[in-house]
């Protein structure tokens, strides 16, 4: 993959317009891996490129927003606000090839976290409405494959969440038991 962490240059802008290049970038998103190259080309043509300046927000927790983002260059961090203290906690750092907002392609829930740029970043954005129209045109088989991919992604995330939850509960119990012995 080409180094896209540097500021925009004319060759990069041309590269972003290249449907074949874009179709290859979409392979980074599991949801699209089973789509044909021609389908990925059409998806790429529906999206746009967004430049997010350093410290600016790509999405804000709680805001309505229906669309997917693929990081083409730069680095962003994901923050979740603590409902008790209102403090923001960094959950993850994202880089080129990472994506976020996939669930909003079929879920109208507000954003669950804030994503901010650590450096100027370049994102491919795909609005949910445009993608829904694409799926309608592609037919039932493509829709079924997409939703099967979604189920796979959700089950993987659920397994990780379960593992993390169990680990955190074990740590809390160890800490609580140690405190009671003191």
Language model features with spans:
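Cytosolic regulatory regions built on CNB/CRP/Popeye-like sensor folds
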Residues: 1-182
């Amino acid at each position: 993959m080409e180094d896209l962490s540097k500021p925009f240059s004319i060759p990069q802008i041309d590269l972003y317009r290249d449907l074949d290049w874009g179709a290859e970038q979409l392979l980074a998103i599991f949801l699209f891996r089973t789509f044909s190259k021609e389908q990925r080309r059409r998806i790429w043509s529906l999206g746009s490129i967004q430049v997010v300046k350093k410290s600016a927000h790509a999405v804000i927790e709680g805001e309505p927003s229906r669309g997917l983002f693929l990081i083409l260059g730069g680095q962003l961090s994901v923050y979740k606000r603590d409902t008790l203290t209102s403090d923001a906690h960094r959950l993850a750092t994202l880089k080129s090839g990472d994506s976020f907002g996939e669930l909003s392609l079929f879920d109208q829930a507000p954003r669950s976290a804030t994503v901010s740029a650590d450096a100027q970043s370049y994102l491919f954005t795909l609005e949910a409405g445009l993608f829904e129209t694409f799926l309608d045109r592609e037919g039932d088989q493509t829709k079924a494959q997409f939703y099967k991919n979604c189920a796979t992604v959700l089950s993987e995330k659920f397994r990780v969440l379960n593992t993390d939850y169990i680990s955190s509960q074990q740590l809390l119990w160890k800490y609580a038991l140690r405190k009671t012995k003191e």
